[in-house]
């Protein structure tokens, strides 16, 4: 079974809530809305949902190419509800993560609704991010 390690680095300073993100030859940033942050970039939660949407799109395109489907587009809208009081430390009576994540997907391709539903099931099955959300992956926090 071929395996690939994917690595990223992130850092924050005492100056603000902007987080610098680096991977390969890319540098991005994350921020928080005002008043905590400067509202100059998406939040970590938004990036998380962006990543799931992007994975849905790219896995869908890969499957379409493999099956020779004349895919015109895949459009994804995602939302999730979260208790911000928990992550801000105002309560301990809940959990930090999203309660539920809804992935609304439009597939523009010459397929029946049933075929589109089957394609969406295959996308969900093959998307690594969906897998990591639905199946618990061990996360190790290691102090360096």
Feature roles, as predicted:
Residues 1-50, 62-144:
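Extended beta-strand/beta-hairpin segments
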Residues 52-56:
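Alpha-helical metal-binding/catalytic segments enriched in His/Glu/Asp
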């Amino acid at each position: 079974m071929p395996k690939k390690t994917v690595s990223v680095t992130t850092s924050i300073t005492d100056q603000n809530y902007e987080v610098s993100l680096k991977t390969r030859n890319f540098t991005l940033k994350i921020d928080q809305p005002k008043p905590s942050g400067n509202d100059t970039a998406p939040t970590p939660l938004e990036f998380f949902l962006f990543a799931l949407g992007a994975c849905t799109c790219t896995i869908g395109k890969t499957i379409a190419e493999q099956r020779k489907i004349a895919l015109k587009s895949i459009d994804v809208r995602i939302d999730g509800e979260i208790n911000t009081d928990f992550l801000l430390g105002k309560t301990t009576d809940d959990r930090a993560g999203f309660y539920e994540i809804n992935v609304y997907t439009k597939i523009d391709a010459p397929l029946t609704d049933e075929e589109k539903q089957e394609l969406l099931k295959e996308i969900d099955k093959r998307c690594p991010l969906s897998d990591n959300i639905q199946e618990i992956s061990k996360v190790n926090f290691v102090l360096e």
